[in-house]
Structures are given as structure tokens and as C-alpha cells.
């Protein structure tokens, strides 16, 4: 199956359909579990960063206004993630020797070099989450392209490695094409519509067509819902939702049942899940999956490479 964005109707509502491929996860795993830690603190909308107004998204405030000057409370909420929350989350993974993928905004990482070094030393993957954590929907294409190049350059300088995964999040209709234009990305995660990776046919700006591996992300198994009206008010419902999702997918991967292993993504934010009253949801979930066998906890790059090896890029 290939998602063909070059067709007159560029959406694919069919996907793998009734017969998804067997993922063949390493060790015969029934599920691949993938944790993403979004590191955005210090790159959010702020007049200090040259933006028109203060941040409005994913904080402790309900429907905050965007001010054309510094918003001290909003800055403090974001600073909590960088000063305290991120370390609380990292400790949970370090004590369990589990890997994760960091969606790192380059300006944020640049403002916290000690943390960037810690990510690398702990063996976590850093995927590029753009230059600034802003909405690119109406940003001129040339500006978005320049931001992407600068973001990659910063990560290269700070880590000594080129980012192999891309996720903008607040993307634009141009983002996927620009990712293909740059090339060299083993996966793109700006997609939420499947439980398995898949190949997408993308037309580059020069008119050529290339396959791009998509490793889907999630907005439901995501602590961002602590900051949404219809979301979680405390740790218990978030833990229960993660547990229910895992249990359902684990059952689908049972060789004696559906025998259809999938992947489960979990999205985390330092300023949200890193709070003491919320971290217990993560702790309980990690304890829950540790009680099951045939569970592969992996970085996104590991999943991408596994998929590309088992299901090579199509030729066209």
C-alpha cells in the first residue's frame, strides 16, 4: 500500500484496509510502544523570540489571550518544563533503561545545551521538531524552508548528527513537500491516521516523485489533553486511556487471535506530564507494560529502519 499524494484527490481514506501487513516486530513482539518527548520550551511564541504575541497553546491556562508584550505567567509555565519537568520524565526512563524519541525544537535545544547533551548521552533519538514552535499554516513557503534548514543546521552542530526524523506538528500544506525536497529523512511523523508505518508518494518542488516513510504520531494518547477542555483533569484518566489502548492493541497482536501487531505512540510534554500530579500516570503505565512479554519499546528511528527493511520503499 502506498499513500499517493500526487493524485487529483490527494487523500487516502483506504489505507491497509481489512488486511494490514504483519509488522514482524523484533522478537515476535505483539506491539511496538513508542514514547515521544516533545521539547518545545524556549521556542514557543513570545515577543522575546521576535513573534507578534505570547503563546496560547498547551499550558495550564484555559484559552489565554496572546499579548503583544511579554506574558510572564506563560513564560513561567513553559520554563517549568525546562527546569524541572523534563528531568522528572527522563529519570523514569533512565531507571527502567527504556529509549524514547525527542521531538526537539532547535531553538529550544539551543537554549538548553546541557539537556541536549543528556538526551544524546542517554541514547535517546532527537528528531527535528522545527526551528520555532509556531503555527506554520500561513507562514510563507520560503520562510518555512529557511526555518527548516536552520533547524537542521543547529541540530547538526549541537549533536554532531543529522536529524533523521521530522515532525513539525503545527505544519502547513507545504511541509511534507519541503521535507521531501531536503531529503535524507528516514521518516516523517506529521500524520495521525494509522496504527502502522506506511510509504507515501510525494511530489517534490522540482516535479520529481519520491517515496517517504511515514511513522504516524498520536494526539489521543497524548498528555496535551491535560490542556484541553475535553481532556484529562488528573493522572487517573490518562493512565486508564493509555492502559486501554495498550491492552486493545496487545490483544490484536496475539498470534492466537487477530495476529495483527500494531504500534502505539505516546506523546509527552515536559511542562504537562512533568508535573508531580501527572507523572504518576506515566509511572503506572510503564509498570503495566513491564508485566507483559512480547513488547518492543523502541525509538522512532528503530521502527522506521525495521519497516524499511521488512517492507522496502516502492519503485515508481
Please describe what each predicted stretch is.
Residues 2-213, 239-266, 272-316:
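Catalytic alpha-helical scaffold of carbohydrate-active enzymes acting on polysaccharides/glycoconjugates
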Residues 206-226:
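A structural motif
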Residues 221-241:
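Binuclear metal-dependent hydrolase catalytic cores centered on His/Asp/Glu-rich metal-binding motifs
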